Amino acid sequence: GNSHEGSSTTPKGVYHLSFAFGKAASARTSGMAYRQINRKSYWIEDPHDRQYNTWQNRNWANNKNEHLIDYTKAAPHNQYQLAIVMDNHGQHNGSGFFIHVKNQWATAGCVSINYNDVRTLLSRLGTKAYVVDVQNRAQLQNY
């Protein structure tokens, strides 16, 4: 469906996979950039913030923003042990869409897969990787 801030739906369309991030200091990639999460790492999800839908290092961010390190702990809070950013630009189109580690809960619009599958995917993705999210084969012609 159509994604917007708070909709908990994965955006339909074609999205560039811009960079990966996670708990470890580094990850095996095929050219895709990787960032290590630290205590100051936030994904800005407040649509009124001028840095909306971006990774920022801050001393503090309001509760509308996602403190990434909170999701690198032991299961089930381990989604961001390893993740890949799906670029979804536009104000109020939803924010923080990632391909990340699967746990016991449904996502809030992200795509979740097993940890080893995230690692394998990341090891094969380059800088020009995209993800296509459609409901059926016929919709592919729209992209």
Task: Show the residue positions of the predicted features.
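Short cysteine clusters
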Residues: 110
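Cell wall/extracellular polymer interaction/catalysis modules
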Residues: 1-107, 118-143
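A conserved hydrophobic position in a structured secondary element of the catalytic/binding core
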Residues: 113
